[in-house]
From Swiss-Prot:
Coiled coil: none annotated. One of its GO terms (molecular function) is protein transmembrane transporter activity. This is Protein transport protein Sec61 subunit gamma. Keywords: Endoplasmic reticulum, Membrane, Protein transport, Translocation, Transmembrane, Transmembrane helix, Transport. It comes from Gryllotalpa orientalis (Oriental mole cricket). It is a single-pass membrane protein.
Length: 68
């Protein structure tokens, strides 16, 4: 019985901690959500442009290397 308790106790403690965390968390209000959404969209755009420009620079370099 002691071995079963040793096996189950970490899962039980994790579930208890998870429930406590979810109860303490609150949903963001509309203003906070919009701020987070805009920041995420700006980040996606910046990463997209960086990827685009890296690809744009590497295409001619690749053609020079392969074309030789």
């Amino acid at each position: 019985m002691d071995q079963v308790t040793k096996f189950i106790e970490p899962g039980r403690q994790f579930a208890k901690d998870s429930i406590r965390l979810v109860k303490r968390c609150t949903k963001p209000d509309r203003k906070e959500f919009q701020k987070i959404a805009v920041a995420t969209a700006i980040g996606f755009c910046i990463m997209g442009f960086i990827g685009f420009f890296v690809k744009l620079i590497h295409i001619p370099i690749n053609n020079i290397i392969v074309g030789s």
